Amino acid sequence: MIVDSSAMVAVIKREPDWLSLSERMDSADRLHISAASYLETAIVLDGLRNPARSAELDDLIEEIGMVIEPVTVEQAKIARQAYRDYGKGSGHPANLNFGDCFSYALAREKREPMLWKGDDFGHTEIRPA
């Protein structure tokens, strides 16, 4: 399973649906996050100016055995095309941002379902987890 930054942030911030997202992660055989999505998650959490919350990201990744996947050249190409097709300003309802495009690319490259929060990826062909 690929995990988007939106799901990671929701779990760490204990947003209303965090438990459901956490349970889905717990049920997965393998968990992967793009290095770009890892950074995006860290930026959001660091912006809260709460050091304990920021530390939870790395603690959670280690605890659940999530693999931070390096961005490959192929993923960069897939992400570029995703932005053209689904990105902000494209007119497509998915309205993917920079970080979303890397989650999308990793899910496409690995042919894995993705866990996310929101409705952006629901407008693409990515399988929900």
Regions found by a protein language model. Give the residues of each.
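Active-site neighborhoods of divalent-metal-dependent phosphate/nucleic-acid chemistry enzymes
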Residues: 67-113
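Acidic, PIN/NYN-like endoribonuclease modules and their adjacent C-terminal/linker elements
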Residues: 104-129
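Short, well-structured N-terminal submotif of metal-dependent ribonuclease cores
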Residues: 1-33, 46-61
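A generic structural signal for short hydrophobic patches within well-formed alpha-helices
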Residues: 8-9, 38, 121-122
